[in-house]
Amino acid sequence: MIVMDIFRYFASFVPAEVLKKTFRIPDSDEYNALMNGLLAEPSGREIDGITEYVFGIDAEKLATVISAVAGIYLFVEYDRISSTVNTATDRKDDRLHVAVTVACPVPDSKDLVSAAIINDRCLEILSSIRRRMREDDDLKRGIEWMDYPATLTVFASKALANSQGWSMEFDIYGIDIV
């Protein structure tokens, strides 16, 4: 279903050795199939500089995972689906709201210039993902990976290991995807 499609899609931007760390507790055949499928061969779309892939919505688990991160991480979360019916075509259109964040824990020992350099690198990685997303619509399945508008905002979270970076919010559009 669409949640795992999103997981797979954004995993394609993560180097395999980093992606391997995402799979912590294999507990089912479906889990193993997903892990083995993604790790079998590189996507060719990996972006250098990403040191962790974090996917989910559980605030406590996210905080635990991110507290152990030392470099730049790609964090993907989702939160709502809106559906409409196009009466002219009797087609259901769905939009899934997603936030994609590229951030890095910034220790208090870093000064503002160091933080700005980190923020600039995070924005560079997020912009690279955004550029690729514009070219990735899956017309066969009726999915637009980024339905504009997309909003980029500064991300700062003391609760997530004092992380700083950039976040992009947008909708994924699809024809009857849920």
Map each language-model feature to its residues.
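Acidic-leaning, charged glycine-interspersed low-complexity segments
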Residues: 118-173
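Small/polar-rich, solvent-exposed N-terminal microdomains that initiate assembly or binding
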Residues: 1-89
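Oligomerization/assembly interface segments of phage tail-like spikes and tubes
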Residues: 92-107, 161-176
